[in-house]
């Protein structure tokens, strides 16, 4: 960060970039659509937080109803003419999403971390060759997004597994911010698993991350006042105060 050597080499700070200010001058709206899920933990949480997190990820990946709902939303967006980026943190989850979507979308392009160079080049060439008037879905792992992935057509992000660090949120959302003809709104679908306290707290942190980069967070109409009976409201007071 602020090591003296940086200032010695580069001089004093002349300008600071604010993410909210940048969002305000872009020629499109920035919105997050919250999608509460009916995910329920079947086992008591692990005492070790790291093991608990891994167990929750495993359960989320295995939740077929949750995956089906995500794919329904993706297909709906494609039919609107949107260009979605479906993002997951696990290769197994990526494969399940791809298999489900290939039955409904002609072009499903899969990019994952650890791909061989030639395999990655073939997938990138396939993506580049798809005409603008043909629908497509890009499915990636978070690690691949961090490897310089860039596609100006993207206007919708599906966050299919929970993350919380603000820098990760900014990096993922940034894939939507390239200017492209006809882009009027960028949209993030956030799948919220509120029955698990750890995941509810992660949602809290994501909301603060979205705000910090200029996004408006939109709750589903069912949350006010009739929250679905199979989804428990989080106990976190920050969530209740904000929403």
PLM regions: where:
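Conserved SF2 helicase motif VI
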Residues: 156, 164-188, 204-207
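A short beta-strand element within the Helicase C-terminal
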Residues: 138-140, 147-162, 171, 187-190
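Conserved nucleotide-binding/hydrolysis micro-motifs of P-loop NTPases
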Residues: 14, 21-25, 37-41, 91-93, ...
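Conserved interdomain hinge at the start of the Helicase C-terminal
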Residues: 45-89, 93-100
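Conserved catalytic network of the ASCE P-loop NTPase/AAA+ motor domain
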Residues: 24-28, 76-79, 102, 128-133, ...
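Post-DEXD/H (motif II) to motif III coupling segment of the RecA-like Helicase ATP-binding lobe
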Residues: 1-33, 210
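Non-catalytic, charged low-complexity extensions flanking SF2 helicase motor domains
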Residues: 56, 60, 187-243
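Conserved helicase ATPase core of P-loop NTP-dependent helicases/translocases
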Residues: 85, 95-96, 105-146, 168
């Amino acid at each position: 960060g602020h090591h003296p050597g940086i200032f010695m080499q580069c001089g004093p700070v002349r300008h600071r970039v604010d993410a909210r200010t940048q969002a305000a001058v872009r020629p499109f709206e920035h919105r997050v659509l919250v999608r509460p899920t009916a995910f329920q933990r079947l086992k008591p949480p692990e005492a070790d937080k790291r093991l608990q997190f891994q167990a929750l990820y495993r359960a989320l990946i295995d939740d077929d109803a949750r995956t089906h709902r995500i794919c329904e939303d993706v297909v709906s967006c494609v039919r609107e003419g949107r260009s979605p980026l479906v993002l997951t943190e696990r290769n197994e989850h990526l494969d399940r999403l791809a298999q489900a979507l290939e039955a409904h979308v002609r072009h499903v392009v899969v990019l994952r971390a650890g791909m061989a160079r030639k395999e990655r080049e073939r997938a990138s060439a396939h993506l580049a060759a798809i005409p603008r008037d043909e629908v497509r879905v890009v499915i990636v792992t978070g690690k691949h997004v961090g490897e310089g992935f860039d596609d100006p057509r993207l206007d919708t992000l599906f966050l299919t597994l929970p993350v919380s660090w603000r820098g990760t949120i900014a990096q993922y959302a940034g894939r939507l911010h390239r200017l492209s003809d006809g882009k009027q709104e960028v949209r993030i679908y956030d799948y919220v698993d509120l029955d698990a306290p750890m995941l509810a707290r992660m949602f809290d942190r994501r909301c603060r991350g979205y705000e910090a980069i200029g996004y408006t967070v939109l709750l589903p109409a069912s949350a006010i006042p009739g929250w679905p009976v199979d989804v428990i409201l989080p106990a976190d007071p920050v969530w209740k105060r904000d929403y």
